[in-house]
């Protein structure tokens, strides 16, 4: 994962960061009955998203920046599309579904037979196919299938899932590599959100098809994620000892936790849920800046050296706090 390379890049205004705000808004709408909150912020959210909607390229979709000539990354758009699909399911506002479908059309434009299938990461470069542009594409496809009952979404989701598993899963530990280059070279870095999205995708496919292999995939991946992306921890602040989400990107970890929560709806596992709850509790109590109330990037709080305010971290913490208290976490 990397920040966009476009000369139009603005670290303070880009779709990836905005997407975490959309996820935070979605988490609040999904898990509370706060109508006033929705009425206060919904129109502003829509207006802001439309500033990123690129109508100069086909198929039309959200771009990385507020610029009609900007870079468009498939994964950045997909994260937004997933939240829009969720928001439609909750509110029945057709605006959300229309734009979620436009994201899907954009995804299909990035899918071809190079390397046997899969979705590219960058619309312009088309030099790699990444787990981060394929795993969430499956999640979006299955959410649209749930909404529309259109079998084309299911078939595309199954196809992309099969390709991603065959090309990007490490058979030694079930976790997912970062990407495969068009040259065939595999970038072997492992990030929590990639494996977490394949976990969620597997559960959604199991729900849609009833095929046990998908549930088996999800359970194996959950155990692998728990072993790799959590660690034993003693808090300098409280002295408590527990398994905690490893330091790194809070946003990556929030995306991974979506997979754990999806699986927990089907087959509960207290070990995973306790680790997530304790991680979030600790982060809430001990990793906030006293002056601003904003969160640092690190989860442990043992060695805070970064500045608070990273928008991805803030959006992730809103999602964490809402999702881990939801019915899915029971």
Listing of model-derived features with the role each one plays in the protein:
Residues 171-174, 206-309:
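Non-catalytic carbohydrate-binding regions of carbohydrate-active enzymes
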Residues 75-78, 82-86, 91-123:
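Extracytoplasmic mature domains of secreted/periplasmic and thylakoid-lumen proteins
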Residues 2-83, 89-97:
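N-terminal carbohydrate-binding/catalytic regions of secreted carbohydrate-active enzymes
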């Amino acid at each position: 994962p990397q920040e966009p390379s476009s000369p139009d890049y603005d670290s303070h205004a880009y779709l990836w960061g905005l997407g975490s705000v959309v996820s935070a808004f979605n988490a609040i709408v999904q898990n509370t009955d706060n109508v006033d909150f929705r009425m206060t912020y919904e129109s502003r959210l829509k207006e802001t998203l439309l500033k990123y909607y690129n109508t100069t390229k086909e198929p039309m979709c959200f771009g990385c920046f507020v610029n009609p000539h900007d870079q468009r990354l498939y994964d950045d758009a997909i994260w937004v599309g997933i939240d829009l699909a969720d928001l439609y399911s909750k509110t029945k506002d057709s605006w959300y579904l229309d734009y979620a479908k436009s994201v899907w059309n954009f995804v299909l434009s990035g899918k071809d037979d190079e390397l046997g299938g899969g979705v590219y990461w960058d619309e312009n470069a088309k030099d790699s196919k990444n787990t981060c542009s394929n795993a969430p594409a499956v999640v979006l496809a299955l959410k649209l299938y749930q909404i529309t009952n259109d079998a084309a979404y299911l078939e595309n989701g199954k196809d992309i899932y099969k390709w991603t598993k065959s090309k990007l899963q490490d058979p030694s530990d079930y976790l997912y590599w970062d990407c495969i280059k068009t040259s065939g070279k595999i970038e072997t870095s492992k990030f929590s959100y990639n494996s977490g999205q394949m976990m969620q995708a597997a559960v959604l496919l199991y729900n849609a098809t009833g095929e046990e292999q998908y549930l088996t995939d999800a359970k194996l991946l959950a155990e692998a994620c728990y072993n790799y992306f959590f660690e034993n921890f003693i808090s300098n602040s409280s002295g408590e000892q527990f398994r905690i989400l490893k330091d790194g990107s809070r946003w990556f970890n929030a995306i991974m936790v979506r997979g754990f929560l999806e699986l927990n709806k089907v087959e509960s596992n207290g070990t995973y849920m306790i680790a997530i709850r304790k991680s979030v509790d600790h982060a809430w109590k001990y990793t906030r800046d006293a002056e601003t109330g904003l969160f640092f990037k690190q989860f442990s709080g043992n060695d805070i050296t970064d500045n608070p305010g990273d928008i991805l971290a803030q959006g992730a913490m809103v999602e964490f706090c809402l999702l881990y208290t939801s019915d899915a976490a029971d």
